[in-house]
């Protein structure tokens, strides 16, 4: 395995995977569920939680540098084979669904250039024309990554720099157009008819979604030139992304009043740019979104392919997925990931699902892997500061599970259940020194049984 990724490439990988499609729709998404007061509290909670999670990853890369398989290996080392697999399965599903959402939003953005009231070509990214285009992009990126992760990471660095230009222009114009009276209008969201704390809870999956990818450097840490760069890259990217998100959401509420902002079509940043600089604003943001999402898609494809590969090398996924090609790219894992993405694209066309549906599912699947990072640090930490970070990361993880609501937890059970069958099959393809204990066998049985009523309740 080649170790060629330096600090700049690792930082770009993390930042690009976070700054994807979400930031361009963030103004409307937040305005629809939260007042300025709730938004400030929500970002405070999320900022603190994500920084604790980033610090937990930084500490773990320092005290357990040999665990270079990312969040999957933390869960496995701390809580056994089954929990480790569940972390890998949940993270991989999140990555697959995130990739589908990026392909959908790219062609939704292209509709700004092609669609008219008389002609709906790309629509919301779920027309047959969009699916054909998304499939072509999917396989172009697939063969690019087969040429080697370093090649893809270099292209991603350029894409990350390019996406910051339209975001920077938006922030500068929004600062110039910001009106404090507009920002303070209905500051606590009385018009929403929901208490402030409930509004805060409603922002949690949205704010988590735009930070998914924070673990990017940890996932590819086995390919890092210097292991100490992994933690630095994570912190640099988190602080940069948090600054961008705060500016974009808070300034937007000072340009357009919250009720009006909540009605703007996504990507809502395009509508705001039209308010600030005329028709050209929409084109600039749509073009920026396309570059941004393509960069994020490239990052997520690298990370998505890495997970089954690493899990297979640790005997959690079937042995075939541990294969690499001559360029040291995880070829079998990449084929698995992109075939699943292709199937999901066809399902999107058949069901008419959109970006927001995919956002919710992807956010839900990442909750357990993130919680297990904090739990592992809490388990092995010896210093008081490290224990405090572990406690904080665990509390944030539990809060997210609570905030996501019971229906989303049911969805998690349904999506984890088929993974257990993969886990049991994988154990047959490897020679294992350790046998599953009674608690793990009971947990497998409970999850499989619980998936039946959970499926019925979701369908019903």
UniProtKB/Swiss-Prot annotation:
It catalyses: L-ornithine(in) + L-arginine(out) = L-ornithine(out) + L-arginine(in). It comes from the Bacteria. One of its GO terms (molecular function) is antiporter activity. GO terms for cellular component: plasma membrane. Belongs to the amino acid-polyamine-organocation (APC) superfamily. Basic amino acid/polyamine antiporter (APA) (TC 2.A.3.2) family. Catalyzes electroneutral exchange between arginine and ornithine to allow high-efficiency energy conversion in the arginine deiminase pathway. This is Putative arginine/ornithine antiporter. It comes from Escherichia coli (strain K12).
